[in-house]
């Protein structure tokens, strides 16, 4: 029977392993190759299990031995334990094999297959019930005397079989449990659970094994008493012999019945193809238990019918053999299509599940990243908000500091005391001056306190604490919503008239607020301010209600934040004050209230300005166009001003100093002049001209005036680039092109001076294209050649150019208009082209807009008018009396327009004319503005108009930002010349020249030279007399200033042309330098090193005449010489130098010369051969004074090697 049991267990393990290998084959994995190492692992585990089990059993047996105290009982127990141990070895091997099979399945099957296997396990458990019956039957056999009369061998076999069947049952249970664990898919905790189940099984096994052994002992005791060792060995040999015989018989019968069973099984397969996979799994799962049950039944039958035992065994063997063969065949054939399909579906589901999990994980990570990014963005915004808040608070404090309204605690207390005194005086009947004469400030000591009764104060206490505390809470939470809007300065004007009605408003508000009191938030302040807090909050409420009466509903987040901040500060300040000082708290709050009101007024004005600009931007009228601003640019002497003179019929160029434009000028060309100038153009539609005129700006062409060219081009809508047809593109022309490119300003080119072409015949009353056709062939050829050359030069600058009458695409190609400012040819075509381009291509830019846009061009001092500013009004309108803010050297200047002067039409703005005074001016115009405090105005920056007083600080701040950049350009030095010019533009040009010439400037001014300017310049006489100079450009010098300058020794250089001024100053510097060189000639000692030529000693004493080689430096007449190697002995002064019998002033390095050295007056003459030898080196005797003189006045005559020699000699002479 043991043999049968072994065969069954081997079959079941083989089935398991084969199925696992089959699943691995379907997936394409080589599971079969991995089975051998797995078996090895299983053996190791089996040995380990066996050792554990043996140790436990030995402990148990020792306990039984101590109880029984009989050697026979111990022998019996040992005899019964051995078969159990053998059975355990077999079960352990089965478990290992099953484990291998289940591992293979786990890799191939998914969760769905595991569920199916669990169902089959539950079915296979049912046949395990007969174990209990076997035990019962065993006990019956023990009691029955007939059965006891059987041979001892049979009894021993039956007991062994029973023990083996119990062991098989336990093993089958373990394998089922393991299969459940594996099929559950919990891979993470699989090994832990398996170990725990193993431990539990061992415990159960111990508990079960004890009673079976005892029952076996009882049976043995009832059948016989003692077995010798020889008997046991004989029984064992008999059992082994019988097993071998049975195996041989089995093999024979298997071969006989193989063919017959094949046919039967094939038929059954054909009948039931669908049931085969299930049966296969059932067989695989059920073989251990079913085999155990059948074995037990066979054992019972063997004990009952000993005669028929052999036949039954044969039948059982045949039956099991056939079953085994069938299973092997089925496995060889492989799984059915349905099984393969099920496995493939399971694999597909597994892959889908993995993909789904992967997608979910990616989505989760993406969500987390988005949340993190959102959090960071919120943190950044919060940080920015805090920084803005801090910056705003800082700016507000700075502004109040500048205005003198940021009071310290001591100042507030002093102010409070003064107000208390005033109140007492007023109560005594003394007349106190009204606050109308003082700066605007709301009177705190008047009606408000007198009108309020104690009942009203009590009723307001709850209301105000709630009203003020709630906004504080809102600030803490960072919620921007707030009902009250910031008050404005305008509210102050109507305050006195509204004070009477305010109490009613407050009473109404207090009634409404009492109803809502439950919903409001209240915050307690640490120190409880009593009446001061109420009074302060009353004022806050009145301010807000004043605003509500006015109907001002504008608001922004930033303003609300400031308002909340101010409320919070008010609370804090109220908490700090002492309760017994009513008057001091009132006045203290008054100053705080003024400050917060100003802040609110500032924000309100800012919003108003922005709103106005926005509205003006929307209300642009494209039908009505303003006059285009046209800028004239070009190189020196190309004829810019001459072209304008021809257009205006003026002679501005003749009146200019040296014919050079040194200021920016503006000319208004009216529509009538345009029509007059373009009458010779046939295809010009004069009736449909939409522009009201043109404003032409003339800029200087000289290199020094690049700042003015830049300023002029920044204003213009379209530019005229004047090019001399005889010279092409010149340096300032290219600079102008680059300026226009950077500003993205459209332009047309005037090819001027065509009258210089040989044989040119003028025809100013006809179109220039027609005039060109009338010219001789040689003139036309020359023109075409020069025009093509200029087109090529433009191409080199990256611009396409074409003659205007050949240009089909004005947007891509720059138009070239041939002109002659001298004869007037091409002037009409130039104006026609300007009009056409501006009203078609630039119509949106020229659309009429009410928003003011103006730029300060020049600052000029005029006799009888004071300092005036020339302004280009680009958009909007200016009125007399408007408050304007203009940039100044020391900050923005606020002043009122006292006069608006316009030159007559077709007249230059900068040229002194009979100006026409206007009350109102519309764009676009060149306007001269009269006003106070314009001396320090900076040109090149915008002019702004404040329509209300509260807008002034806002506009000032706007200008400050732009002002910083311009002011950085003008940096004064401690030592330098004093520069004075008529306009800021020319002053900038002069300063630029001084910078390039490395001439420092210590002071600047605009306007005529006065005594104060001479005083400032005379300061330099003490520091550095060479800089005690005034450079006056295009300004008048007062007579008393000139006299003072002569007496103090200050030089004033004056010129109307900037280059003449440069030349005069340069000449002065050179003369001054020569004068100083002559003065320091005897102090300055040039360094030299000479070697004596011993064969050329002409005279050894008084004077020493010797031939020398100049090794380093330079030898000059008057250089004192000494010999360092002979204790620095002074041998005399060089009085004469000769080369080839010719006298020279200087001998340079490398020359061989003859020098005459005369002794120093008053000293004994030195002698060659006694005081110094031919081997000694002669050097010039330098000192600190001589080195300084060289640095200051002889630097140009020194070379780098000379300075190196000075460094060397300084060490020799130990000069610091």
Curated annotation (Swiss-Prot):
The keyword Transport is annotated on this UniProt entry: no
Region of interest (G5), residue spans: 820-822
Keyword Transmembrane: no
CDD domains, A to Z: aeIF5B_II, IF2_aeIF5B_IV, IF2_eIF5B
Annotated binding of GTP, by residue: 636-642, 659-661, 752-753, 755-756, 821-822
Domain tr-type G: 625-842
Residues that bear Phosphoserine: 66, 108, 114, 137, 139, 165, 172, 183-184, 187, 191, 209, 215, 223, 437, 544, 553, 556, 584-585, 587, 591, 1164
Co-factor: note: Binds 1 monovalent cation per monomer in the active site. Structural cofactor that stabilizes the GTP-bound 'on' state. May also act as a transition state stabilizer of the hydrolysis reaction.
Phosphothreonine modification, residue list: 107, 497
Active site residues per record: 702
Biased composition (Basic residues): 96-106, 148-160
Enzyme class: hydrolase
Start and end residues of each stretch annotated as G2: 659-663
A Pfam short name: GTP_EFTU
GO annotations of cellular component type: cytoplasm; synapse
Region annotation G1: where it falls in the sequence: 634-641
Biased composition (Basic and acidic residues): 7-17, 49-63, 171-180, 232-279, 322-333, 348-422, 433-448, 511-525, 563-584, 594-604
EC number: 3.6.5.3
Region (Disordered), start-end ranges: 1-604
GO aspect biological process, one term: translational initiation
Region: G4, residue numbers: 752-755
Predominant subcellular localization, coarse grouping: cytoplasm
Quaternary structure and partners: Interacts through its C-terminal domain (CTD) with the CTD of eIF1A (EIF1AX) or with the CTD of EIF5 (mutually exclusive) through a common binding site. Interacts with eIF1A (EIF1AX) from the location of the start codon by the 43S complex until the formation of the 80S complex. Interacts with ANXA5 in a calcium and phospholipid-dependent manner.
Similarity comment: family membership: Belongs to the TRAFAC class translation factor GTPase superfamily. Classic translation factor GTPase family. IF-2 subfamily.
Purpose: Plays a role in translation initiation. Ribosome-dependent GTPase that promotes the joining of the 60S ribosomal subunit to the pre-initiation complex to form the 80S initiation complex with the initiator methionine-tRNA in the P-site base paired to the start codon. Together with eIF1A (EIF1AX), actively orients the initiator methionine-tRNA in a conformation that allows 60S ribosomal subunit joining to form the 80S initiation complex. Is released after formation of the 80S initiation complex.
Record's protein name: Eukaryotic translation initiation factor 5B
Organism: Rattus norvegicus (Rat)
Taxonomic classification: Eukaryota, Metazoa, Chordata, Craniata, Vertebrata
Gene assigned in the entry: Eif5b
């Amino acid at each position: 029977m043991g043999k049968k049991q072994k065969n069954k267990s081997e079959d079941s393990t083989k089935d398991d392993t084969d199925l696992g290998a089959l699943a691995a084959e379907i997936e394409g994995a080589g599971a079969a190759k991995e089975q051998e190492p797995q078996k090895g692992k299983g053996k190791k585990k089996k040995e380990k299990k066996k050792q554990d089990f043996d140790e436990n059993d030995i402990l148990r047996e020792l306990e039984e031995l101590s109880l029984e105290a009989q050697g026979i009982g111990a022998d019996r127990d040992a005899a019964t334990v051995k078969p159990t141990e053998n059975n355990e070895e077999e079960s352990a091997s089965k478990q290992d094999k099953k484990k291998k099979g289940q591992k293979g399945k786990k890799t191939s099957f998914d969760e769905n297959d595991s569920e199916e296997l669990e169902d089959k396990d539950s079915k296979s458990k049912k046949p395990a019930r007969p174990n209990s019956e076997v035990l019962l039957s065993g006990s019956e056999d023990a009691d029955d005397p007939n059965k006891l009369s059987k041979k001892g061998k049979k009894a021993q076999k039956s007991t062994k079989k029973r023990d083996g069947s119990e062991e098989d049952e336990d093993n089958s249970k373990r394998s089922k449990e393991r299969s459940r664990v594996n099929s559950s898919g919990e891979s993470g905790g699989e090994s832990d659970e398996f170990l725990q189940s193993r431990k539990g099984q061992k415990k159960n096994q111990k508990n079960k094994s004890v009673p079976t052994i005892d029952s076996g002992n009882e049976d043995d005791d009832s059948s016989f008493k003692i077995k010798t060792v020889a008997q046991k060995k004989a029984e064992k040999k008999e059992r082994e012999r019988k097993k071998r015989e049975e195996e041989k018989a089995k093999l024979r019968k298997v071969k006989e019945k193989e063919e017959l069973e094949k046919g039967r099984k094939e038929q059954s397969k054909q009948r039931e193809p669908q049931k085969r996979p299930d049966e296969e799994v059932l067989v695989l799962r059920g073989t251990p238990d079913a085999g155990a049950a059948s074995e037990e039944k066979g054992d019972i039958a063997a004990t009952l019918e000993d005669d028929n035992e052999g036949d039954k065994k044969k039948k059982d063997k045949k039956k099991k053999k056939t079953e085994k063969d069938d299973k092997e065949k089925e496995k060889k054939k492989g799984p059915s299509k349905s099984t393969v399909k099920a496995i493939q579906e399971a694999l597909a589901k597994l892959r889908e599940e993995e993909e789904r999990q992967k997608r979910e994980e990616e989505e989760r990570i993406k969500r987390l990243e988005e949340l993190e990014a959102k959090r960071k963005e919120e943190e950044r915004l919060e940080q920015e908000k805090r920084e803005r808040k801090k910056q705003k608070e800082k700016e507000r404090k700075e502004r109040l500091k500048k205005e003198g309204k940021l009071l310290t605690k001591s100042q507030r207390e002093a102010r409070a005391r003064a107000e208390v005194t005033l109140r007492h005086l007023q109560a005594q009947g003394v007349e106190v001056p009204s606050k109308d004469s003082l700066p605007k400030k709301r009177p705190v000591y008047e009606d408000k306190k007198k009108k309020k009764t104690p009942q009203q104060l009590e009723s307001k206490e709850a209301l105000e604490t709630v009203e003020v505390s709630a906004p504080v809470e809102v600030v803490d939470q960072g919620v921007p919503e707030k009902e009250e809007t910031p008050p404005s300065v305008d509210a102050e004007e109507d305050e006195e008239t509204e004070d009477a009605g305010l109490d009613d408003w407050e009473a109404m508000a207090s009634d409404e607020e009492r109803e809502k009191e439950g919903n409001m938030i209240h915050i307690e302040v640490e120190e409880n301010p009593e009446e001061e807090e109420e009074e302060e909050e009353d004022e806050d409420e009145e301010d807000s209600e004043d605003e509500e009466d006015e109907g001002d509903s504008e608001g922004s987040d930033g303003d609300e934040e400031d308002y909340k901040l101010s409320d919070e500060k008010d609370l804090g300040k109220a908490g700090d004050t002492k309760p017994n000082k009513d008057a001091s708290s009132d006045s203290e709050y008054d100053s705080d209230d003024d400050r917060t009101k100003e802040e609110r007024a500032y924000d309100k004005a800012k919003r108003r300005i922005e709103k106005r600009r926005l509205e003006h931007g929307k209300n642009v009228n494209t039908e009505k166009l303003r006059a285009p601003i046209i800028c004239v640019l070009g190189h020196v002497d190309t004829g810019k001003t001459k072209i304008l003179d021809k257009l205006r019929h003026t002679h501005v160029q003749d009146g200019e100093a040296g014919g050079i434009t040194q200021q920016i000028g503006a000319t208004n060309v009216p529509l009538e002049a345009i029509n007059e100038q373009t009458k010779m153009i046939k295809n010009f539609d004069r009736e449909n001209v939409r522009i009201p005129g043109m404003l032409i700006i003339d800029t200087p062409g000289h290199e020094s005036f690049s700042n003015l060219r830049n300023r002029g081009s920044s204003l213009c809508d379209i530019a005229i680039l004047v090019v001399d047809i005889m010279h092409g593109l010149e340096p300032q022309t290219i600079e102008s092109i680059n300026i226009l490119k950077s500003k993205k300003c459209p332009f047309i080119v005037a090819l001027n001076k065509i009258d210089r072409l040989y044989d040119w015949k003028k025809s100013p009353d006809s179109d220039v294209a027609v005039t060109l056709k009338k010219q001789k062939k040689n003139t036309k050829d020359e023109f075409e050649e020069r025009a093509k050359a200029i087109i090529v030069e433009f191409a080199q600058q990256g611009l396409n150019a074409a003659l205007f009458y050949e240009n089909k695409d004005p947007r891509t190609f720059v138009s070239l208009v041939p002109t002659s400012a001298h004869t007037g040819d091409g002037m009409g075509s130039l104006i026609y082209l300007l009009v056409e381009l501006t009203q078609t291509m630039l119509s949106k830019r020229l659309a009429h807009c009410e928003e003011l846009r103006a730029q300060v061009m020049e600052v000029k001092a005029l006799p009888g008018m004071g300092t005036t500013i020339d302004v280009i009004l680009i958009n909007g309108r200016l009125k007399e009396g408007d408050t304007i803010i203009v940039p100044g050297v020391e900050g923005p200047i606020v002043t009122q327009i006292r006069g608006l002067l316009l030159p007559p039409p077709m007249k230059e703005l900068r040229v002194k004319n009979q100006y026409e005074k206007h009350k109102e001016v519309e764009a676009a115009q060149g306007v001269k503005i009269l006003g106070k405090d314009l001396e320090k105005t900076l040109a090149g920056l915008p002019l702004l108009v404040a329509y209300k007083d509260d807008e002034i600080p806002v506009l000032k701040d706007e200008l400050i930002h732009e002002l910083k950049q311009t002011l950085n350009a003008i940096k004064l030095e401690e030592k330098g010349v004093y520069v004075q010019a008529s306009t800021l533009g020319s002053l900038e040009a002069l300063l630029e020249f001084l910078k390039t010439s490395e001439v420092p400037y210590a002071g600047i001014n605009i306007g005529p030279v006065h005594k104060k300017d001479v005083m400032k310049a005379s300061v330099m006489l003490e520091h550095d007399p060479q800089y005690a100079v005034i450079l006056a450009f295009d300004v008048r010098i007062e007579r008393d200033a000139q006299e003072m300058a002569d007496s103090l020794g200050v030089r004033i250089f004056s010129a109307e042309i900037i280059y003449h001024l440069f030349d005069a100053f340069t000449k002065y510097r050179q003369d001054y330098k020569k004068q100083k060189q002559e003065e320091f000639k005897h102090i300055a000692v040039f360094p030299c090193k000479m070697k004596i030529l011993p064969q050329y000693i002409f005279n050894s004493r008084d004077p020493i005449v010797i031939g020398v080689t100049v090794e380093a430096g330079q030898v000059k007449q008057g250089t004192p010489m000494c010999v360092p190697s002979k204790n620095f002995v002074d041998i005399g002064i060089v009085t004469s130098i000769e080369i080839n019998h010719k006298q020279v002033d200087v001998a340079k390095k490398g020359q061989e010369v003859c020098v005459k050295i005369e002794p120093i007056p008053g000293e004994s003459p030195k002698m060659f051969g006694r005081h110094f030898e031919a081997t000694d080196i002669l050097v010039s005797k330098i000192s600190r004074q001589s080195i300084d003189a060289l640095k200051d006045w002889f630097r140009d005559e020194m070379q780098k090697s000379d300075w190196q020699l000075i460094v060397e000699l300084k060490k020799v002479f130990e000069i610091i």
